[in-house]
Amino acid sequence: MGQGSIIGYEINEKTCQISFYNEKDLQLAIEQMFIANEIPYEREVRLSNKDIIDFTVELDVGKVGVELKIDGARNALLRQINRYLSHDSIKALYVVGTPYWVNNIPIQLNNKFIYRHRILVGVF
């Protein structure tokens, strides 16, 4: 069996765990959480020819982007989210991922907030 990661989440006060091996698996897991919690979302939203964000969610403040990362370089992600936040349609961004540096990215770019959540994983 290959190596994977497990994350836990809560649906209607019930804790659940999911496994993921790559970013597409994590996208599917996040999508399942949105569905289970009846959160309206769009997946792989094209913001421009170059920019496709993993998810958008409509909140009271407007459209919020969700970008997932399980590997990659911090500076590459900063360039990517800077592009995403330059779009008028995106009011804020959630970055969710496993790299150690996720919680060290800025909390604001382009005068828009960035919310960060590092997934602490168990490898099996």
Model-derived segments and their meaning:
Residues 49-53:
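Short beta-strand or tight-loop elements
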Residues 55-72, 84:
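Conserved catalytic cores of phosphodiester-cleaving nucleases, focusing on short active-site segments
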Residues 70-78, 85-118:
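Nucleic-acid nuclease catalytic cores
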Residues 29, 79-80:
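Well-ordered alpha-helical segments embedded in enzymatic catalytic cores
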Residues 1-48:
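Acidic-basic catalytic patches of nuclease active cores, encompassing PD-(D/E)XK
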Residues 19, 23, 44, 57-59, ...:
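Generic alpha-helical hydrophobic packing signal
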Residues 1, 58-60, 115-124:
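Non-catalytic C-terminal interaction segments of nucleic acid-processing enzymes
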